């Protein structure tokens, strides 16, 4: 079972000057925040995605993760996050999902985002299985 979806990640990190970025104001607000996180709530009609899942046999949550990654990949701000007291620019995104592990607990799993759905699906299945079994 998969759950909450968050976006972050990157393999190559570059520290940037916050005052020279479009994230300067957000960085200043988040710098001393106890939990620097933003949560969006929105009701979405996922009927077409559910039909696609049933028609293709692809997991619904994987499709949701891919759609969120696809939307986020076009927004520059998602690549830049505060880390400690630094502002870091990442080279790629990953979608973080919560996986029910074999001990009936929850574990976090990062799936590197790929615009190619078949590659994202392979990574999703392999990584969520690995995380599920490793606890």
Q: PLM features: residue spans?
A:
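Small-residue-rich loop/turn and linker elements
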Residues: 78-110, 114
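Short, Lys/Arg-enriched N-terminal segments with co-localized hydrophobic residues
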Residues: 2-12
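Helical lid/core segments from catalytic subdomains that handle acyl or acyl-like groups
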Residues: 101-135
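Generic structural motif
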Residues: 43-49, 71, 100-103, 114
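Short secondary-structure capping/junction motifs at helix and strand boundaries
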Residues: 75-82, 133-135
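Acyl activation and transfer enzymes in specialized metabolism, enriched
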Residues: 49-75
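N-terminal beta-alpha "docking/capping" segments at the starts of catalytic domains
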Residues: 10-53, 58
């Amino acid at each position: 079972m998969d759950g909450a979806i968050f976006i972050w990640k990157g393999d190559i990190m570059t520290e940037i000057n916050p005052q020279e970025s479009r994230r300067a104001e957000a960085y200043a607000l988040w710098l001393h925040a106890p939990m620097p996180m933003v949560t969006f709530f929105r009701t979405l009609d996922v009927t077409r995605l559910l039909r696609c899942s049933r028609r293709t046999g692809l997991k619904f949550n994987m499709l949701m993760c891919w759609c969120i990654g696809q939307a986020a990949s076009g927004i520059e701000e998602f690549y830049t996050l505060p880390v400690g007291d630094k502002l870091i620019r990442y080279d790629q995104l990953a979608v973080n999902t919560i996986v029910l592990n074999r001990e009936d607990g929850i574990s976090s799993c990062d799936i590197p985002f790929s615009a190619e759905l078949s590659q994202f699906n392979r990574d999703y299945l392999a990584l969520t299985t690995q995380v599920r079994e490793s606890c």
